[in-house]
Amino acid sequence: IYKNRQFNIPYFDFNRRHYLEYDLIKAINSINNSKIMKVGILSPFIPTSSILKKIDGLSLFEELKKSYDLAAIPFFSKKLPEDIDLLLIIGTNILQKEMLYSIDQHLMSGKNLVILLDSFYRINPSNNQTQLSISEQINDISDLLQVYGVKINSDKVIGDINYSSPVIDKRQNQINYPFWMKIDKKGINKDHPINIGINNLLFVESGELITLNENHEKLVYTTNQSGIVDNNLFKIYNTNNLINEFKQDNLSRTLSVILYSPFQSAFNKEENKLKNHISSSQNNPSIILFSDTDWIFDPFSLQK
């Protein structure tokens, strides 16, 4: 603990033995760096007034507060604060055009993005009233991502027979539900340091990520026993009916990916871009993208 910040070195974790030097250097650099990294959070789920308090259902944020300064950005703002080092975006189906431009320029300036989107929001169902829709114009976050190299298939929900979770239906019968995917080590890229120490993840009615170039690395993925179902059916069908709709199609699907630079601005063709517009990425930023938001909330992230 240094200057009221907690720096963890997981050197007792056998799974991270190959990354001990990396963890040590990272911790030492954090201590020597007088500037604490500021993480901006842009989400309709996080009120700006609540970020300094303990947020019910989001223990993840309490862990982040140990190492970073967190700042909740008003959801309908038109511009990001300039002092944000990293931007965390959660469930932003609707954003103003000016904010989309600000996010684009944040990335182009060399700052990283972490983005969580979804096909069906279980924890925050009001978000299901709107849906991402890729278009030729830059209208939502999915349009930005397509320019950066990935398409989110947000109108389909992914299931996997091999990762099915037991749930209770209305008749109190236990059934295996393929759309709540308990992903084990076979579906987690253990070659990337970000995943070391993760034994399983629970992705809940997730979407699919389709990469459009080679500048990426898959982080989380299904087996080849996956399938897709239209997300609108999840609003009207019960659990058993949804299971009956599921048909596996021998395809493995990507659920999380890291995109590497270089990136081109999504607004290079816009006439109203600012005079100091940055057209291509500087200093090698990256984007970490997840096709599910529910997995970070306590009901699905904390083991009981």
Could you tell me what each predicted segment is?
Residues 1-63, 74, 302:
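Hydrophobic targeting/anchoring helices
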